Each structure stands twice: as structure tokens, then as C-alpha cells.
A protein has these predicted regions:
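Nucleotide phosphate-binding/pyrophosphate-handling subdomain across enzymes
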Residues: 2-3, 10-13, 76-189
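Short, surface-exposed connector motifs at secondary-structure boundaries
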Residues: 19-28, 158-164, 186-189, 235-236
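C-terminal helical cap/extension that packs against the catalytic core
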Residues: 31-53, 68-71, 136-137, 145, ...
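Generic structural signal for well-ordered alpha-helical scaffold segments
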Residues: 19, 101, 152-156, 227-232
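Active-site-proximal loop/hinge segments that shape catalytic or ion-binding/gating pockets
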Residues: 245
Length: 245
């Protein structure tokens, strides 16, 4: 629901705006959505005489995962490897593969092997990006409730027994209270920072909100202070994640 002032305030309106990019006689590759959203996309594809392809999430089979990546099967592919972490990235990979399979019809050089290699080489800066292993330190661009839920789910799955430490900074126009409530459920400690922006929420104000859910909060004057203190004060097996906007 980001950018609601521009796209609309409900899923149907947002989908209709997004569907505006569909061109006549084109190809549409869809990440499976709710029934109401898919109806909008299907109608737009029909109106523009475009072919619609939908990734088949039911054919995804996760085989192994760890901080260095994941191995999974999808459709006719076996033992695909990706560096991106989290089950949601398997779905993103499935959509990318579906798009490549459509492009194979028009572009020479795209083969199952090049798709396999491309998926393995894919990187996404700031999306559960591992920047250090000692201590384990991630940065994630989660800046809304949905993004934070995905981040929390990933951390819980990968590190069920580890203490989780968060460095958080947000803009004051974000729904940060909802974000805090979601993260606090798994948090051992927070370091709050003030983003470099005129719209930034001061670290102290963010800390006041966090204290409603977690007593272990440290206010930092600068972002670099939050990073340094979190890294220095982390104990063995602690996991640090910096997120926000």
C-alpha cells in the first residue's frame, strides 16, 4: 500500500493503475494475487489482447536454505540456487523464470541453463543483505508493515534460537507503530537512529514508541553510532538487522 495518494486507497484501484502499463498485444507475467486483483489484471490483458502468464507457486519445493542461499525445485527445473534469502524470494524467482520462459520465444540465447545461471547470480541490495558474518549482520529495506512481516518471518525461520538485535530508523510519515509492534515480538534489543531526511522521525521519539513493547532500547545520535554499538555489544550467535527508511 505504498504511494496510496497516487495509486488509490484499495487493492482494486491500485491494481487498475498498475495494469495501465500493459501494452496492446503484449505478454503479462503475473505474481499470483488475490482474486480481486487478478480479475483486474485479467480484464486489462483481455482488453489489450495480451497473453497472461501466472507463476505456479504450487510447484516450488524448497530443498535447503542457509545464510549463503537457498536450493529449490520449480516447474521443470531442479536444484536451482539463489543467494537471496527468505521464502518470498523463491516466489520472486519463480516469476522471473516464468518471464524468461516467455522471452525465450522471441530472444535467442535464453536457455534453461542461462536461466539457471542468471537466477544464481541475482543479487538485491538492501533485501536481507548479509553484510557481515561476525557478527551476523543484515540490512533490509523494510519500511512498511508488510515488508517488516516478511523480514521477521525470514529471521525467525533462519535463526529460531538466536537473539535478534535491530537498528531502526524511519520517516515520520510511515506507519512505524505497526512496524515496531511486529518486530518487537522477536526483538532482544533496539538501537534507534535518525535517518538523514527532513521527514525523519527523531530517534528519541521512535524509542518512546518501542518502549511500549520492549524495554531494551538504546538511542543513538548518529546512524554510524548505532551500527558501531550494535556490532561491538553483540554477543556470540546474536543476529543484527538494520532496517527502516
Amino acid at each position: 500500500f505504498d504511494h496510496m495518494k497516487i495509486l488509490g486507497d484499495n487493492l482494486t484501484q491500485i491494481a487498475r493503475e498498475k495494469a495501465g502499463i500493459i501494452k496492446e498485444n503484449g505478454n503479462v507475467v503475473l505474481y499470483p494475487q488475490s482474486e480481486e486483483v487478478e480479475k483486474v489484471i485479467e480484464d486489462a490483458a483481455a482488453q489489450t489482447s495480451s497473453r497472461l502468464f501466472k507463476a505456479d507457486f504450487a510447484s516450488i519445493k524448497l530443498k535447503s536454505f542457509g545464510i549463503d542461499g537457498q536450493i529449490f525445485d520449480y516447474s521443470t527445473f531442479t536444484d536451482l540456487k539463489i543467494k537471496l534469502l527468505g521464502r518470498h524470494q523463491l516466489k520472486n524467482a519463480a516469476v522471473a523464470i516464468a518471464a524468461c520462459q516467455v522471452l525465450k520465444e522471441k530472444m535467442q540465447g535464453i536457455t534453461d541453463e542461462t536461466i539457471r545461471k542468471g537466477i544464481a547470480k541475482a543479487r538485491w541490495k538492501g533485501r536481507m543483505e548479509l553484510v557481515c558474518k561476525e557478527p551476523i549482520f543484515f540490512i533490509d529495506g523494510a519500511h512498511n508493515e508488510d515488508g517488516v512481516k516478511v523480514m521477521v518471518d525470514t529471521l525467525e525461520e533462519y535463526f529460531p534460537q538466536n537473539r535478534k538485535i535491530f537498528i531502526m530508523g524511519v520517516l515520520k510519515d510511515k506507519e512505524y507503530s505497526k512496524m515496531v509492534k511486529t518486530v518487537a515480538r522477536i526483538a532482544y534489543k533496539f538501537y534507534t537512529v535518525t535517518p538523514v531526511s527532513e521527514r525523519a522521525l527523531p530517534a528519541k521519539e521512535l524509542a518512546d514508541v518501542i518502549k511500549m513493547y520492549c524495554d531494551n532500547v538504546i538511542i543513538c545520535d548518529k546512524i554510524v553510532e548505532g551500527i558501531e554499538r550494535a556490532a561491538e555489544e553483540a554477543e556470540e550467535n546474536d543476529v543484527i538487522c538494520a532496517f527502516g527508511s
